[in-house]
């Protein structure tokens, strides 16, 4: 039995039900699935599993604006309203949440990793609704556990921050997840392939830039780089990064976007990547056929305005799933 795991029991869709797929919405089509059901066998074809990670403990430890614990419900509500374009050959299963208000950050990350591995064993593509960016380490661990030690797993992070902070004295938080991944790779004598899109210089100290400069497998583009390059050159940079890689895990921190597009985040961003450009880049990553799982994190509903940020996060999920369904 999975720990800290709660299957979904409540629908987030409150509109009229229509059997016609031409007019269906996500909320009509998504089906509940209990990962603890021992009768389940691996699914055939391309299907997705949506799980919430109800934790912003890492944000609290990192002195951010708490509230991301409420994000999974907010994103589900927005996603349920979107039109369904995938016919009846692709399914998105809502498998519930990882939740544990009295559990430690490390315990919740471990619980998420086990749930992710269970999804992969069932041949379901994981979609995780954070939660703070501590979500990423649990998601990454689960993906790695589903692979053999020699299998590669590159990481692309759309984020204003490197999230490579040391954690030896403070313990892990929302800003340390990718340093934990890096350290795991070093311990296993693997190269940590990590590409950050949307870095803002005013959000990262010199220690982090120095760490990146000395690390062979880490690359980044600043938000200003992306603005100047345009999506086609950014996509070519991603292609070069993924050359020779078989798998990539994608994580989207909503603080990558300006406060005008994403006001409800744990750490607001005055600058930021254009969401329209981001959609094109995300679709390109999905079209590589290498994307094995993704998450959206750091949506903070108590700080949102008219669900702008939750809706944008749901929009990214919509377009990623559309492309992944065609290229997997």
Swiss-Prot record:
Its EC number is 3.5.3.8. CDD domains: Formimidoylglutamase. One of its GO terms (molecular function) is formimidoylglutamase activity. Mn(2+) 2 binds at residues 159, 161, 253, 255. Transmembrane segments: none annotated. Keywords: Histidine metabolism, Hydrolase, Manganese, Metal-binding. The keyword Hydrolase applies. Binds 2 manganese ions per subunit. Catalyzes the conversion of N-formimidoyl-L-glutamate to L-glutamate and formamide. PANTHER family: ARGINASE/AGMATINASE, FORMIMIDOYLGLUTAMASE. This is Formimidoylglutamase. The lineage of its organism: Bacteria, Bacillati, Bacillota, Bacilli, Lactobacillales. The gene is hutG.
């Amino acid at each position: 039995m999975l720990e800290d795991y709660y299957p979904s029991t409540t629908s987030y869709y409150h509109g009229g039900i229509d059997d016609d797929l031409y007019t269906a919405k996500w909320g009509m089509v998504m089906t509940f699935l209990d990962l603890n059901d021992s009768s389940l066998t691996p699914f055939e074809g391309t299907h997705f599993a949506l799980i919430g990670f109800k934790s912003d403990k890492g944000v609290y430890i990192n002195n951010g604006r708490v509230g991301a614990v409420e994000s999974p419900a907010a994103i589900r509500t927005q996603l349920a309203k979107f039109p369904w374009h995938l016919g009846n050959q692709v399914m998105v299963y809502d498998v519930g949440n990882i939740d544990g208000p009295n559990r430690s950050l490390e315990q919740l990350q471990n619980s998420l990793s086990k749930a992710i591995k269970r999804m992969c064993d069932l041949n379901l593509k994981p979609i995780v609704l954070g939660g703070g960016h501590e979500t990423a380490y649990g998601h990454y661990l689960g993906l790695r556990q589903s692979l053999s030690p020699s299998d590669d797993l590159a990481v692309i992070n759309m984020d204003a921050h490197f999230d490579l902070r040391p954690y030896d004295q403070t313990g892990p938080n929302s800003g340390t997840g990718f340093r934990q991944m890096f350290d795991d790779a070093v311990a296993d004598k693997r190269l940590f392939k990590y590409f950050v899109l949307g870095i803002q210089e005013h959000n990262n100290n010199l220690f982090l830039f120095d760490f990146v400069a000395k690390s062979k497998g880490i690359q980044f583009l600043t938000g200003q780089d992306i603005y100047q390059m345009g999506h086609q050159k950014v996509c070519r940079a991603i292609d070069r990064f993924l050359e020779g890689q078989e798998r990539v895990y994608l994580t989207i921190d909503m603080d990558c976007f300006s406060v005008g597009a994403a006001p409800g985040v744990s750490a607001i961003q005055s600058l930021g990547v254009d969401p329209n450009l981001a959609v094109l880049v995300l679709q390109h990553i999905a079209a590589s056929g290498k994307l094995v799982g993704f998450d959206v994190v750091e949506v903070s509903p108590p700080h949102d305005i008219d669900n702008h940020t939750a809706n944008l996060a749901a929009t990214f999920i919509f377009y990623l799933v559309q492309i992944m369904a065609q290229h997997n």
